């Protein structure tokens, strides 16, 4: 579990902001949301496969030339 040390004379809001930033960097919240409910292995494979297809289409769109406008 990530933690921070509150500096002397540091406002509470700043300490909370630093804590949120460290949590975001470690990816703890995203992992927690992913593990919140059980996902069947087939559903997980299907979701990952769909994400891979989406990434592939996005990469292909950026690599292709724009259509000629004449």
Curated annotation (Swiss-Prot):
Cellular component GO terms, alphabetical: ribonucleoprotein complex; ribosome
Region (Disordered) location: 40-70
GO MF assignments: structural constituent of ribosome
Family from the record: Belongs to the bacterial ribosomal protein bS21 family.
Highest taxon in the source lineage: Bacteria
Keyword field: Ribonucleoprotein, Ribosomal protein
Compositionally biased region (Basic residues): 45-61
The UniProt record lists the keyword Ribosomal protein: yes
Single Gene Ontology BP annotation: translation
Pfam families: Ribosomal_S21
Organism lineage: Bacteria, Pseudomonadati, Pseudomonadota, Betaproteobacteria, Rhodocyclales
Protein's name in the database: Small ribosomal subunit protein bS21
Record Gene3D superfamilies: Ribosomal protein S8 (1.20.5.1150)
């Amino acid at each position: 579990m990530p933690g921070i040390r509150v500096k002397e004379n540091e406002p509470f809001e700043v300490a909370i902001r630093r804590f949120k930033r460290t949590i975001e960097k470690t990816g703890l919240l995203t992992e927690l949301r992913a593990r919140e409910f059980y996902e069947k292995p087939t559903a997980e494979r299907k979701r990952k496969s769909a994400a891979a297809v989406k990434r592939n289409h996005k990469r292909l769109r950026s690599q292709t030339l724009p259509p000629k406008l004449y």
